[in-house]
Amino acid sequence: MTLTQEFDTIAAISTPLGEGAIAIVRLSGTDALKIAQSVYKGKNLAQVASHTINYGHIFEEERLVDEVMVSVMRAPKTFTREDIVEINTHGGIAVTQEILQLLLRNGARLAEPGEFTKRAFLNGRIDLAQAESVMDLIRAKTDKAANIAVKQLDGSLSKMINNIRQEILESLAQVEVNIDYPEYDDVETMTSQMLLEKTAHFEQLLENLLSTAKRGKILREGLKTAIIGRPNVGKSSLLNQLLREEKAIVTDIAGTTRDVITEFANIGGVPLELVDTAGIRETDDLVEAIGIERSKKALAEADLVLLVLDASLELTDKDLELLELSKNANRIVLLNKTDLPEKLDINQISGDFIRISALKNENLSAVEEKINQIFFAGEIEAKDATVLSNARHISLVEEALKALKEANNGLALGLPVDLIQVDVTRCWQLLGEITGEAAPDELITQLFSQFCLGK
C-alpha cells in the first residue's frame, strides 16, 4: 500500500478562464479545509461529512465576495488522496480570481500545471500511463479517442504492461538464482533454449500491442488531410460540409482560397485535421502563389489526400497533373458537382473514385467508409481492446522490443545466459517507464508540466 506523501496545500482555478454559469476553485492538501474555512461563512467544514456539497458565502473580512457551493472530500478517497475542497462560484473572471487570491493570502500556494494529477501519481492513486490518459481524455477530439483514453485511465494498458513486466521479472529471477546459486536444486535451470522460448513469447506480446499503435495514434492525434484540386472545383464547399459549418469562402471566383485553412472534423469517430489548400494553378498573384506553394507542402506532408475534381467539366492538364502528383499517397478521388450533368471521362482516372455533391451534401458518407477501409481495414475500434495511442508509450514499446530482439540474436549466437540477461533487463526497465515504475524524475516533471493549470 502506498503511503500518502506530505505536501503543502495548493490552489488553482480548475475551469477555463472566461465568463460562464459557474467556475471551480480547487484546493488540495492537509490544510485545505482550514484555508477554505478562513474565507467561507456557512457550515463548519471541519464537521461536515465527506463528499458533500454545502451552501455558503465567501467573504473578504466583512465584504461579501460571492454566494457559493463548497464541496468537501476527505482523504484518502479523493483524486489526490489528500483533503480536497472545491468552491463552486459564479463564473466571472473577476470573482474567481479574487477567491483564488484570498486562498493564496490565507496559506495556499498556487498550483503548478498538472500538480493535482501529479499528486495523484506520487500518492499512488494512479500510475504514469493513467496520468497521461487524463490529458488525453481532456484533449480527445472524438468519442472514439475519448473511449481509448478512458480505458487507459481505468488501467487497461497499465494492467497489460504490469503483467508482461511480471513475467519478464520471473524469468530474470530464475536466471539470477541459476547464476548465484548453481548448487540450488529446487529451481529449474534456465537454459539458453528455455530463455529463447520465453523472450520469443515476450516479443510476441509486445508486437501484438504495437500492432494497435497505428490505429491508436490516428484516433488520438488525427489524420492530416489535404484537400487538393484546381481552383473552383468545390474544395471549400467540401470543407464546410465536413465541418458542418462555413469556415471557407465559397464563390465561383478562381483563387478565392489564397492560403491554407486548417480545421478539425469528426468523421465517423476519426479526427481529420482538414487542410483546405489554395487551388494549385499558375498565377502572377504573389500572395496566391505563396499559398499554392504551401498547398504543395501540405500535400507532401498529408496522411490522407482528398483530390477534388469537377465532374461537370472535362479533365484538364492540371487535373491530370494532380492525379499523377498524388498517385502514391493515401488518396481518395472525389468527383464533385454530381448535381450537374457529368462531362468528365472516368476512363482517364486510374483506381477508385467517389461521386459526391458537396453543395447538396450527397454521398459524403461514402468518404467516411473509404477512410475506414484505408486506415482501419473497416474496423476503427476493437471493443475491449487495449490500444497504444501515446507517442511516448509507442516509442518505449519499440525500444523494449528492440532489446528483446537483441537478446534473441545473442541467444542464437550462443552467448551465455548471464550476458543475455542485460538486454532482457533493459526491456523490463523500458516498460516500467510507461507506468512510472522506472521513470526518471526529470521525465515525470516534464510530463506534468504539459498539463493545464488546475488539473
From Swiss-Prot:
One of its GO terms (biological process) is tRNA wobble uridine modification. GO terms for cellular component: cytosol. Keywords: Cytoplasm, GTP-binding, Hydrolase, Magnesium, Metal-binding, Nucleotide-binding, Potassium, tRNA processing. Its cofactor is K(+). Mg(2+) binds at S236, T257. Its EC number is 3.6.-.-. K(+) binds at N232, T251, I253, T256. It is found in: Cytoplasm. Pfam families: MMR_HSR1 (PF01926), MnmE_helical (PF12631), TrmE_N (PF10396). Residues 222-376 form the TrmE-type G domain. Binds 1 potassium ion per subunit. GO terms for molecular function: GTP binding; GTPase activity; metal ion binding. CDD domains: trmE, TrmE_N. (6S)-5-formyl-5,6,7,8-tetrahydrofolate binds at R26, E86, R125, K455. InterPro entries: G_TrmE (IPR031168), GTP-bd (IPR006073), GTP-bd_TrmE_N (IPR018948), GTPase_MnmE (IPR004520), MnmE_dom2 (IPR027368), MnmE_helical (IPR025867), P-loop_NTPase (IPR027417), Small_GTP-bd (IPR005225). Its main location: cytoplasm. It comes from the Bacteria. GTP binds at residues 232-237, 251-257, 276-279. Exhibits a very high intrinsic GTPase hydrolysis rate. Involved in the addition of a carboxymethylaminomethyl (cmnm) group at the wobble position (U34) of certain tRNAs, forming tRNA-cmnm(5)s(2)U34. Homodimer. Heterotetramer of two MnmE and two MnmG subunits. Belongs to the TRAFAC class TrmE-Era-EngA-EngB-Septin-like GTPase superfamily. TrmE GTPase family. This is tRNA modification GTPase MnmE. It comes from Lactococcus lactis subsp. cremoris (strain MG1363).
